[in-house]
């Protein structure tokens, strides 16, 4: 089954393709089909993910999967939230993972409450008008490190510490990260939702 991924983020593509492999799903980045980025005007992950999935499906005629994910910092009242990808631009930096990490650490200087959560909301639709979108939410709580650690992953992985391991996501092997990450959790939920709603009574492939 071909499924359009409403994202051009290579990190997301690799993680989601690996986690949905048991279904025989082939994820195709929307850019490969000539689809641009959808607007994300909403204040919640689920609304933005649904908008992106519908947009990708409408422009390709294929089922679509969208992921809206972000970092929610306790000391910032849950921000940057849906603005996570553009966090650095608020402080005069160009958009990008390294600048996001730099800006976050600068803004958290002198803050002792390092609690934060990474949230991934996956939405899948069979068509733009699908009345029953599949929605899966994964959340993992941790703490923001005081300096980047590790070389793996992407986004805020170098500063998101998982207390159970005492390591950042970027310090963990990919298979360990995927087993415990927010996207890993939402992907496992989505896998079961697709099996139940889309592939029930079929051989899945």
From Swiss-Prot:
It catalyses: XTP + H2O = XMP + diphosphate + H(+); dITP + H2O = dIMP + diphosphate + H(+); ITP + H2O = IMP + diphosphate + H(+). GO terms for biological process: nucleotide metabolic process; purine nucleoside triphosphate catabolic process. Keywords: Hydrolase, Magnesium, Metal-binding, Nucleotide metabolism, Nucleotide-binding. InterPro entries: dITP/XTP_pyrophosphatase, ITPase-like_fam, RdgB/HAM1. The active site is at residue 68. Substrate binds at residues 7-12, 69, 154-157, 177, 182-183. Binds 1 Mg(2+) ion per subunit. Its cofactor is Mg(2+). This is dITP/XTP pyrophosphatase. It comes from Acidovorax ebreus (strain TPSY).
